[in-house]
């Protein structure tokens, strides 16, 4: 309510009337669902895949579950920074692409990748340095604490690939409507690599939790390689609204 009041009170460009809200052309509807449907499917399949990770970890015993839960909780706090960066990337690039400034959008994408890399290195170094004081806040056994520490080190090692994927998939590729490729990257990475390796490592090979976690994280490298190739193809570098009435 506050946001709507501000938008219409200030008569911002998005303060449109009912005619504008519901005056959809057939091309607009087709473009909207063609772009948004893969995003919805992407989030659903990715969320379901991460649930499967939890099922695999849950079969490894209480200590393994405790270790991975603590490690991922610590990691999730840090990931918020890159989620915000990827969202900012999508907004800024989407604005430039919508205005037809394709060259500027391409330049900004490079800047965001550089910013992401610098932030990743900085956060990874800090995380490695403070992991033991943070782990010390938990009342856990030395064995669980060791596993948490190893999981955090593994996460730090994979951070460049994982955070690149955040900015590339959510910020760059989606801003240009390349959502089908985003769906392919996330779904294939989770379901063809991450989930099979999680269950193989946990139930068949009987590996320690940190080794299973390292196997699962290889999906980020897969997505980073294919995602970078897709980024270089520049199929995302387009104005989605140029011909929509």
Predicted regions and their residues:
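Transmembrane alpha-helix boundary and packing residues in multipass membrane permease domains
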Residues: 39, 43, 51, 55, ...
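Hydrophobic faces of transmembrane alpha-helices in multi-pass small-molecule transporters and flippases
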Residues: 2-3, 21-52, 56, 77-81, ...
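Hydrophobic positions within alpha-helical transmembrane segments of bacterial inner-membrane proteins
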Residues: 44, 48, 120-128, 163, ...
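Helix-terminus/linker motif at the lipid-water interface of multi-pass membrane proteins
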Residues: 44-77, 95-96, 135-142, 204
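Short runs within selected transmembrane alpha-helices of multi-pass transporters and secretion channels
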Residues: 1-4, 83-86, 155-175, 181-193, ...
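Short alpha-helical transmembrane segments in multi-pass integral membrane proteins
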Residues: 1-36, 93-158, 201-245
């Amino acid at each position: 309510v506050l946001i709507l009041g501000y938008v219409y009170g200030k008569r911002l460009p998005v303060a449109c009337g009912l005619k504008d809200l519901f005056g959809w052309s057939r091309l607009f509807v087709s473009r909207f669902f063609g772009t948004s449907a893969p995003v919805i499917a992407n989030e659903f399949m990715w969320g379901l895949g991460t649930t499967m990770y939890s099922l695999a970890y849950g079969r490894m015993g209480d200590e393994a579950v405790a270790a991975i839960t603590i490690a991922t909780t610590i990691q999730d706090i840090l990931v918020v920074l890159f989620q915000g960066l990827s969202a900012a990337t999508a907004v800024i690039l989407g604005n430039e692409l919508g205005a037809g400034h394709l060259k500027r959008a391409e330049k900004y994408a490079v800047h965001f990748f550089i910013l992401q890399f610098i932030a990743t290195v900085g956060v990874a170094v800090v995380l490695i340095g403070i992991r033991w004081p943070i782990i010390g806040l938990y009342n856990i056994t030395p064995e669980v604490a060791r596993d948490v520490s190893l999981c955090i080190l593994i996460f730090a090692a994979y951070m460049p690939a994982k955070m690149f994927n955040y900015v590339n998939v959510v910020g760059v590729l989606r801003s240009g409507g390349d959502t089908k490729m985003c769906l392919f990257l996330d779904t294939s990475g989770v379901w063809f690599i991450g989930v099979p390796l999680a269950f193989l490592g946990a139930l068949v090979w009987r590996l320690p939790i940190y080794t299973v976690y390292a196997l699962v994280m290889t999906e980020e490298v897969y997505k980073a390689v294919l995602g970078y190739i897709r980024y270089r193809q520049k199929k995302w570098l387009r104005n989605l609204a140029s011909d929509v009435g």
